[in-house]
Amino acid sequence: NITKILECIRERGFQYFVIDCGWYRQEGVPWDISMGDYEVSDILFPEGLEETVRQIKAAGLIPGIWFEIETVGKAAKAYSMTEYLLKKDGKPLTSYFRRFWDMCDPWVEEYLTKKVIGTLKKYGFGYMKIDYNETIGIGCDGAESLGEGLRRNMEASSAFFEKVKREIPGIVLENCSS
């Protein structure tokens, strides 16, 4: 499908082509409950993501990709890694079918560095669309108050985005949320 889209938009003045949510979706599992593991879908990219990115670049466009780095969907293996997820009253903070990474945890930073920054570098992405589709609520454990725990987690998220920019100079970050 991306190949057809690239043909349609060729020479129309676009600068970026962003692969949106679901690029990691496995067969029979909706994209919105499977974020967190970020393994490229063999179903959606049977020739691999490398080939798709090559086609995007060959069309004269800068390739981009979607991440929702701070959340984990219930179908992801990461959903059960509760030692690395935010908690409220000692239980994993869960909203509908999502949980949230503890962005202050060094293991989480290392994991996301591998999954997010590693993916961006490996495939040569020059644009990252960052989404956030769930409310985290009033706060989380880990500080003298739920609000302070939340503030610290958001500060760690911001630090991770700065790390992305340091590791990949010139990358464009689009931050959006619903």
Language-model features: where?
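Aromatic-lined carbohydrate-recognition surfaces of secreted/lumenal glycan-active proteins
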Residues: 18, 61-74, 155-178
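Short glycine-enriched, charge-decorated loop/helix-capping segments at active-site entrances
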Residues: 38, 144-147
